[in-house]
From Swiss-Prot:
Annotated binding of Zn(2+) 1, by residue: C49, H71, E72, C179
Documented EC number(s): 1.1.1.1, 1.1.1.-, 1.1.1.284
Alphabetized InterPro entries for the sequence: ADH-like_C (IPR013149), ADH-like_N (IPR013154), ADH_3 (IPR014183), ADH_Zn_CS (IPR002328), GroES-like_sf (IPR011032), NAD(P)-bd_dom_sf (IPR036291)
Keywords: Cytoplasm, Metal-binding, NAD, Oxidoreductase, Zinc
Source organism (scientific name): Oryza sativa subsp. indica (Rice)
Key word Ubl conjugation present: no
A GO MF term: zinc ion binding
Annotated protein name in UniProt: Alcohol dehydrogenase class-3
Residues involved in Zn(2+) 2 binding: C101, C104, C107, C115
Binding positions for NAD(+) per the UniProt entry: 50, 204-209, 228, 233, 274, 297-299, 322-324, 374
Residues binding an alcohol: T51, H71
Length: 381
């Protein structure tokens, strides 16, 4: 059914980042109607992720200001542009920063979940059709972010970047499947393919690290070692499947040696969930000679490089990376939502705080406190 606002500019509230590292402000933003191949979504709930903060901090070379950040959200389709067939007004959806067009070289390869169709536009804060933004304030364009821009009551996304989900799913919970939880689960299931009986090490016990633990537990890992410099995280991590804990601050030896000693030669799989290149090296080097695999999940700052001795790889270790946990967004996010509804995966347990969009700056402060996993913001208050 067509909405009353179809084809019209909508004025709504959005959190605008005018410049790097300056508090966001709630503004009245004009959101243009969707063009061909685009979808306008009423965002109901959006969560905060460290990737949003990374761009807001000014360290992201692709960061453009002013912009509307946010990429972990859920909402309802308000209207669709010409040629859009897979979603319609009223559908419940999760915007996906990882597109899936099913037509490009990447999508057709069968080897990756990456998609090349809209990246050239989303990487510079615009839409594909006309290389312009759908957001403006008094005629001044406001850039998009990651093709999602969910810190707004309404957003416009490409149709290849939105997953239709079961309307029974609570949007204030399944919004987390738009990034962090899916990334951690998929790193285990899709990228590493952890087998039953494996020994796993997880560096960094934030939302993504805990989702890795959850995935490893469901895969039947025999030992799941959580590594973090904040010992307060350990009690929470037990609930997600972590079986033992190591705080690097408690040891004089390099952390990789501590883990090798604990595991009779090293772990079968390790996951770096921080984005620290020196920890990435530790994660690789704590893997067992001959077969250990380390997966880089955390996003390092631009320009940083990883290093290790080639001998580490020559002797059988494997170093891999993952984006969105290897999940194909439009095809598999709905499947993850069903797994949640069937109580096969945790999601609610990652939500430690609930606030309103107007409290977004306070929410970002919380993100850096040890007790916060995910803070979910309601946009309609």
């Amino acid at each position: 059914m067509a909405s009353s606002t179809q084809g019209q500019v909508i004025t709504c509230k959005a959190a605008v980042a005018w410049e790097a590292n300056k508090p966001m402000t709630i503004e009245d933003v004009q959101v243009a109607p969707p063009q061909a191949g685009e979808v306008r979504v009423k965002i109901l709930f959006t969560a905060l992720c460290h990737t949003d903060h990374y761009t807001w901090s000014g360290k992201d070379p692709e960061g453009l200001f002013p912009c509307i950040l946010g990429h972990e959200a859920a909402g309802i389709v308000e209207s669709v542009g010409e040629g859009v067939t897979e979603v319609q007004p009223g559908d419940h959806v999760i915007p996906c920063y990882q597109a899936e067009c099913r037509e490009c070289k990447f999508c057709k390869s069968g080897k990756t979940n990456l998609c090349g169709k809209v990246r050239a536009a989303t990487g510079v804060g615009v839409m594909m059709n006309d290389r312009k933004s759908r957001f403006s304030i008094n005629g001044k364009p406001i850039y998009h972010f990651m093709g999602t821009s969910t810190f707004s009551q309404y957003t416009v996304v490409h149709d290849v970047s939105v997953a239709k989900i079961n309307p029974q799913a609570p949007l204030d919970k399944v919004c987390l499947l738009g990034c962090g939880v899916s990334t951690g689960l998929g790193a285990v299931w899709n990228t590493a393919k952890v087998e039953a009986g494996s020994i796993v090490a997880i560096f960094g016990l934030g939302t993504v690290g805990l989702a890795v633990a959850e995935g490893a537990k469901s895969a039947g890992a025999s030992r799941i070692i959580g590594i973090d410099i904040d010992s307060k995280k350990f009690d929470v991590a037990k609930n997600f499947g972590v079986t033992e804990f190591v705080n690097p601050k408690d040891h004089d030896k390099p952390i990789q040696q501590v883990i090798v000693d604990l595991t009779d030669g090293g772990v079968d799989y390790s996951f770096e969930c921080i984005g620290n290149v020196s920890v990435m090296r530790s994660a690789l080097e704590c893997c067992h000679k001959g077969w250990g695999t380390s997966v880089i999940v955390g996003v390092a700052a631009s320009g940083q490089e990883i290093s290790t001795r080639p001998f580490q790889l020559v002797t059988g270790r494997v170093w891999k990376g993952t984006a969105f946990g290897g999940f194909k967004s439009r095809s598999q996010v709905p499947w993850l939502v069903e797994k949640y509804l069937n109580k096969e995966i945790k999601v609610d347990e990652y939500v430690t705080h609930s606030m309103n969009l107007t409290d977004i700056n306070k929410a970002f402060d919380l993100l850096h406190e040890g007790g916060c996993l995910r803070c979910v913001l309601a946009t309609d208050k």
